[in-house]
Amino acid sequence: EISVRDWSSDVCSSDLEFLTARLHAILMERGIPADLVDAVLSVDVERVAEAGSRAEALAAFRRESDFTELAVAFRRVVNILPKGFSKVVDPSRFVTSAERALHAEAATLRAETEHLVRARDYFQALQRIAAIRPIVDMFFEEVMVMVDDRDLQENRLAILKEVADLFSGIADFSKIAVAP
């Protein structure tokens, strides 16, 4: 397995940029769409050998019926999150059942998908993550995130951050083109 983490600090960022560009070209030659390649290479490019597997799994998952809905739900989640947001969820501040449900499902999926990502079963991880979409939809239908109560607002944003983090081991879904 090739990992940039194993290289000495003498390796220039230009070398990493060259390798990333080369990997981009290789994945494109394999027929993987540019937006999916960009999404995969935006996440943990240090693990070069895994980037191809993640891109292929993402391309296969794109052909699934619930891909577009999942990509739209992810965008909805990340669009509301402030840059660099890093608060932690406080379950004692939950007001609605939708908050509890989304937090619980995110925790369950995190445990399941971390195992699948470590096993490099990216397609199965994506299928499992897709299970959260109806709960995300329910959350947005029932919960006002940007409320005046700052603590409540931050807690709700923290729940959404947990959802966004589910994707972080595979791809940056915000880079994926989705038909309207």
Residue ranges and their predicted role:
Residues S9-P180:
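Amphipathic alpha-helical "coupling" segments that flank catalytic cores
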Residues E1-V11:
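Positively charged, low-complexity/disordered segments
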